[in-house]
Curated annotation (Swiss-Prot):
Its main location: nucleus. Changing residue 67 to R: In sld5-12; temperature-sensitive mutant. Defective in DNA replication. It is found in: Nucleus. Keywords: DNA replication, Nucleus. GO terms for biological process: DNA-templated DNA replication; double-strand break repair via break-induced replication. This is DNA replication complex GINS protein SLD5.
Length: 294
């Protein structure tokens, strides 16, 4: 099976084709109440598992945070399944709305309801909607491409992670379904290429590609000692009193305490401040969404 980046990004362009007019002329109330001020699809979205209202603005903010974290992180971060599902659904709905407006279906409905159709001078909001939608697609594409580049780079590391029974995170949580397919196909092609080109001509004891017992680790792992810039956000749910890791420093400000292994020193990370730290030191705080990479 041949899988490339176009297969994973195809979902972003599925709903940009022409809309069937027979579905529009039914006078659905869910379409007529929308106008050119809609940001990304419907403003009402319910998470199927938790039934928590999530606004489009919050989804966009979470996407930008995930995008920045992924680009600045040396490792592959967990895939935000629910966030991406909502965003792709909003993109589909907004694309359909823009298509309806551009083809004049909403103008026809306004005329039938004794309302004047939209004049040509008022098409500017439509252009703004299209521009904003393309900006959102660009961020999602950049986010996915960044993840795919890490999947290519750490292919053997991900295979080892998947086979490790003591791993704290599963591959299904770390990758999306399409990314898992891409990873499996890419790793098989790469292993076959290396075996046919090099390994089969070498002695059997030298054919292992995942040897970690020698002086050089053959598995390319993320650089855990990489320095990163972080912004300390605090508890993501806003429940400051329920966070067991949150403390107060000598100035009475809330902070997190981390330990630098090399120096065996503790450092206080004050809420709202910016620091430069090794990634390994703040990795757990990043996973808990208590700090953000910048």
């Amino acid at each position: 099976m041949d899988i490339n980046i176009d297969d994973i990004l195809a979902e972003l362009d599925k709903e940009t084709t022409a809309v069937d007019s027979t579905k529009i002329t039914q006078g659905s109330s869910s379409t007529t109440h929308r106008d050119a001020n809609t940001i990304v699809g419907s403003s009402l979205d319910l998470n199927d598992k938790t039934q928590i209202y999530v606004s489009p603005q919050q989804d966009f903010s979470d996407l930008m945070k995930s995008w920045k974290n992924e680009r600045c992180s040396p490792e592959l971060l967990p895939y935000p399944h629910q966030l991406m599902k909502r965003l792709l659904n909003r993109i589909s709905m907004q694309s359909q709305l823009i298509e309806n407006i551009s083809m004049g279906f909403l103008d026809m409905q306004n005329a039938s309801n004794a309302n004047p159709p939209m004049p040509n001078e008022s098409k500017l909001p439509l252009l703004c909607m299209e521009t904003e939608l393309e900006r959102l697609k660009f961020v999602i594409r950049s986010y996915i491409r960044c993840r795919l580049s890490k999947i290519d780079k750490f292919s053997l590391y991900l295979r080892q992670l998947n086979e490790d029974e003591n791993s704290l995170i599963s591959l299904t949580d770390l990758l999306s379904k399409d990314e898992i397919k891409y990873h499996d196909t890419h790793s098989l092609i790469w292993l076959k290429l290396v075996n046919d080109s090099i390994l089969k001509y070498m002695p059997e004891e030298l054919q292992a590609i995942n040897d970690t017992e020698g002086s050089v680790n053959m598995i390319d792992e993320p650089d855990w000692n990489k320095f990163v810039f972080i912004h300390v956000n605090g508890p993501p749910d806003g429940k400051w009193n329920e966070d067991p890791l949150l403390q107060e420093n000598e100035f009475g400000k809330p902070c997190y305490t981390v330990t630098i292994p090399d120096l065996k020193e503790e450092v206080e990370l004050t809420i709202g401040s910016i620091y430069v730290m090794r990634y390994e030191v703040i990795r757990d705080l990043l996973r808990d969404d208590k700090v953000a990479l910048i």
